[in-house]
Regions:
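Conserved Radical SAM active-site core
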Residues: 1-129, 136-141, 150, 154
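A short secondary-structure junction signal
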Residues: 82, 140-143, 180-183, 187
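Short, hinge-like loop/turn segments at secondary-structure boundaries
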Residues: 120-122, 147, 186-188
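Surface-exposed cleft-lining segments at the edges of enzyme active sites
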Residues: 137-146, 172-177
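Conserved C-terminal portion of the radical SAM core fold
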Residues: 152-211
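Surface-exposed, flexible loop/turn segments at secondary-structure boundaries
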Residues: 109, 134-136, 175, 208
Length: 214
């Protein structure tokens, strides 16, 4: 883990990534791609130490309220967040200035910030997006070894349902011959129905092509 002083925090579509890199160890992760310009090892987390200060400046300068998104490129609830609490500090600012938030994660650590998310949802809108890849817990621990299991994520969704916070599930990636079975997909859909999610996102089937040198 290393710290940097970032120049900006919000993208043109109001997305932010407080961290760069990941320690979840998901074997299918495409964020490792060279197209994202990483200059450090993916597991060596880059921490934008001044993220809260940059976010506050950006929120103050906006003319219209909007939804702030986080989690598209890097999970905001990595293990490092337990100690650093940068995601929590940014949520506190979103709450303070009465913006909405859409936050994507695979970690039940998000439950720590239930109080702030409830406050944001009362003033604007808070949407929790949880990725679910496989209903099979054994397979989950192989595909995503260092993060909450699918059942633990389901239990978190149930807590957000009880709190009245809308949720969305990313059913992705679908990996041919690995998690593309009827039993797996139906199992996740059953979780989604029980948790009362407001939407299910399934982008595409994931097929990686490897070119071997002769």
């Amino acid at each position: 883990m290393h710290f940097v002083e970032a120049k900006g925090i919000l993208s043109s579509n109001n997305g932010m990534n407080i961290y760069r890199g990941c320690t979840h160890g998901c074997i299918y992760c495409d964020s490792r791609s060279n197209c994202y310009g990483f200059t450090h090892e993916f597991e060596d987390i880059e921490v934008k130490a001044n993220a809260p200060q940059l976010l506050e400046k950006a929120l103050k300068s906006k003319r219209k309220k909007c939804m702030i998104g986080t989690g598209a490129m890097c999970d905001p609830y990595l293990q490092a967040e337990e100690k650093l609490k940068l995601t929590r500090r940014c949520l506190e600012l979103i709450d303070k200035y009465e913006y909405g938030v859409a936050i994507q994660t695979k970690s039940t650590r998000i439950l720590r910030d239930m109080d702030i998310l409830k406050s944001i949802n009362a003033k604007a809108k808070a949407v929790v997006q949880m990725t679910m890849t496989t209903y099979d817990e054994t397979l989950c621990k192989i595909l995503e070894p260092n993060v909450s299991t699918t059942h633990e994520r389901f239990e978190a969704l149930m807590q957000f349902k009880k709190a009245g916070i809308p949720t969305v599930v990313w059913l992705t990636p679908i990996l041919p011959f690995i998690n593309d079975t009827k039993e797996n997909i139906n199992g996740i859909l059953d979780y989604c129905m029980e948790a009362g999610v407001k939407g299910i996102i399934c982008i595409s089937i994931c097929i990686d092509v490897f070119f071997l040198k002769p």
